[in-house]
Amino acid sequence: AIQIPVGSEPIHYYFEIRAGKIVCYYNELGVTRQLQEQYSFGIIPGFHTPDWAKGAVMYQIFVDRFYNGDSSNDVLTNEYFYISGHSRRIEDWSKIPDNMDVNNFYGGDLQGVMDKLDYLQDLGVEVIYLNPIFVSPSNHKYDIQDYDYVDPHFGKIVHDEGNLLADWDKDNTHAKRYIDRVTNKENLEASNAWFIDFVKEIHKRGMRIILDGVFNHCGSFHKW
């Protein structure tokens, strides 16, 4: 065991391994021949791993690609324009994804995760780790536009009005269906309420849930 004294500031470290003239390094990337300090291990003083997480079987879920439990909340083709193209609803889950796949949506949602809780428990899963679930125009949702609400495309769409974009139209001020879906308070509050029940069901089963919080940056669609 190695004892590393810590103060109040985070510290970073890596291992340097020497065998004769051969030098390599061990860090978050594994063993490398080149030193890359940005991938050093880190220690945050005062942080304590909760006991329930130690040794727990965790299952990470990229929600859009897991299971479609509610087709009524699927992102629609031409619902809005994002980065390099219009949003696209993908029907064939077995097709090879596009290289630029960020605006392709397969319809996976939180209802799909709920529907598969028995399956996950049968696998021995104790903790579900969800990739970001808050309002965002991408399928990965690391570019959040509203931290206060679960994205209705993952939750509940109870109010659904407005037009889709024409094939030639890249102006999202015309994306009335998208705007209604992700800003209408009925949809936002219904999605949050559904998520609360979802978490209760997970806890009732003796399982835990971890959310991926992305707080060091937001997306270009942000509400601020």
What is the meaning of each model-derived region?
Residues I4-H12, R33-W224:
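Acidic/aromatic-lined carbohydrate-recognition and catalytic surfaces
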Residues A1-S8, G20-V31:
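Aromatic- and glycine-rich beta-strand/loop motifs that create alpha-glucan
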